[in-house]
């Protein structure tokens, strides 16, 4: 009996929304394989690092993820399953941080745009674009600066030991 966990590659860092989608669809027993780009995620199948991929093909607000469709064709891969993941953004800071003490917020540009109301309510906040939502949490926590916060999902806060300063800060709850 093969007891090795299924290895699932995803684009992003541990705590990313795609990792949450993989675990939600396939269960906690999988081994997640983070990759920095979609190209590297798809390459994980060919180089034997992963058995499956979890990649977004569409976002209800941003539309189709065209690069993923191109890579599906380039690698001759087929979609085997689908899941819908609600995208809920949290404002995440270091332990000891307070909402009143925040002076900068970082995240992927799409996440920053999806949380415009929160950010606009705090004109003193500097916006800092990042490559990845979960990666922005990792960076904020690594710096330990209580005046910095990141926008990402709850999974990233738990993974990196961040504190959720505000929950569900996205402008549109119908983001999947």
Where are these regions (language model features)?
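Domain-level signature for soluble enzymes in the chorismate/prephenate branch of the shikimate pathway
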Residues: 1-176
């Amino acid at each position: 009996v093969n007891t090795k966990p299924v290895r699932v590659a995803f684009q992003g860092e541990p705590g990313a929304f795609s990792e949450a989608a993989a675990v939600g669809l396939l269960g906690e027993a999988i081994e997640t394989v983070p990759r920095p780009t979609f190209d590297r995620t798809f390459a994980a199948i060919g180089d034997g690092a992963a058995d499956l991929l979890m990649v977004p093909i569409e976002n209800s607000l941003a539309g189709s993820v065209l690069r993923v469709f191109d890579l599906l064709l380039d690698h001759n891969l087929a979609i085997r399953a689908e899941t819908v993941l609600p995208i809920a953004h949290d404002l995440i800071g270091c332990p000891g941080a307070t909402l009143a003490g925040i002076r900068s917020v970082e995240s992927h540009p799409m996440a920053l745009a999806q949380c415009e109301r929160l950010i606009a309510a705090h004109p003193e906040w500097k916006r800092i674009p990042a490559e990845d939502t979960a990666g922005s949490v990792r960076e904020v926590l690594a710096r330990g600066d209580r005046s910095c916060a990141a926008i990402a999902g709850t999974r990233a806060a738990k993974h990196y030991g961040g504190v959720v300063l505000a929950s569900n800060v996205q402008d549109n709850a119908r983001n999947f």
